[in-house]
From Swiss-Prot:
Pfam families in alphabetical order: IGPS
Organism: Oceanobacillus iheyensis (strain DSM 14371 / CIP 107618 / JCM 11309 / KCTC 3954 / HTE831)
Protein name: Indole-3-glycerol phosphate synthase
PANTHER family with a match to the protein in the record: INDOLE-3-GLYCEROL-PHOSPHATE SYNTHASE, TRYPTOPHAN BIOSYNTHESIS PROTEIN
A molecular function GO annotation: phosphoribosylanthranilate isomerase activity
EC number annotated for this UniProt entry: 4.1.1.48
Originating gene: trpC
GO biological process: L-tryptophan biosynthetic process
Length: 261
């Protein structure tokens, strides 16, 4: 069984259990911030900074992290958005992390999870997310389209994550505003930064925002993403392990590169 299959099996169990529960995030009025608007106004590569305690590929990264403290550091360093891992079993995150972060910052917050059901989208929105992630590798195309439509009707922005040319082809059938190209193969967890370069050339970047995800460590990595047509990068482990956060942010915030199809 692949890593992804194992995660999805567990996620289905979680969803089934969740439907028997009632979660109350309280009466709050968290404004929905537009990530798309921020990206389109930026003159340099935008950065989505991720809060990630652990992962199946890296094990424990920083288990004792205070998500609010880390989120505030990210915002002060210049993050355009914050990604919060909410998967509990494999990434040691939670919806409580998402709620606390969304209340503490004034930039968009992404709920990063393996979403397979509408109830997860409801929970993400209720906890304060303004963006969610839908992974093509985790969903049949028809189900992906249903969840995409459901999320956008709730006023959420959606990152459609792909890793292969076939997934990208399927994603483009719904003309998404944002495509996330994951350099990490979710079946093997291997990383190849050339994935963004190879897939981005198939996307009209005048119509669709590209985000390069995974493996971003150096200015050269960020430059490769920008030259490939990405307007943003998602960075997790590099920042979670950083002892010089502001410096690392500045290194990765490279100029945008105009590219036409």
């Amino acid at each position: 069984m692949t890593f992804l299959a194992k995660i999805l099996e567990e996620k289905q169990t979680e969803v089934n259990s969740r439907k028997q529960e009632k979660i109350d995030f309280g009466s709050r009025n968290i404004p929905v911030h537009s990530f798309i608007q921020l990206i389109n106004q930026a003159s340099s590569l935008s950065i989505i900074a991720e809060i990630k305690r652990a992962s199946p590929s890296k094990g424990e990264i920083q288990m004792d992290i205070d998500p609010v403290e880390q989120a505030i550091k990210y915002e002060q360093a210049g993050a355009s958005a914050i990604s919060v891992l909410t998967d509990q079993r494999f990434f040691k995150g939670s919806l409580n992390d998402l709620q606390q972060v969304s209340e503490a910052v004034s930039i968009p917050v992404l709920c990063k999870d393996f979403i397979i059901d509408e109830i997860q989208i409801d929970d993400a929105k209720d906890a304060g997310a303004s963006i969610i992630l839908l992974i093509l590798a985790a969903l049949p195309l028809e189900r992906f389209q249903e969840l995409y439509n459901y999320a956008t009707k709730q006023g959420l922005e959606v990152i459609c994550e792909v890793h292969t040319a076939e997934e990208l082809k399927n994603a483009l059938t719904i003309s998404p505003a944002i495509i996330g190209i994951n350099n990490r193969n979710l079946k093997s967890f291997d990383v190849d930064l050339q994935t963004t370069k190879q897939l981005a050339q198939r996307v009209d970047t005048n119509k669709t925002i590209i985000i390069s995800e995974s493996g971003m460590r150096t200015a050269s990595d960020a430059t490769l993403a920008a030259e490939s047509g990405a307007k943003a990068i998602l960075v997790g482990e590099t920042f979670m392990r950083s002892n010089q956060l502001e410096t690392d942010f500045n290194n990765l915030r490279v100029p945008l590169v105009e590219r036409s199809i």
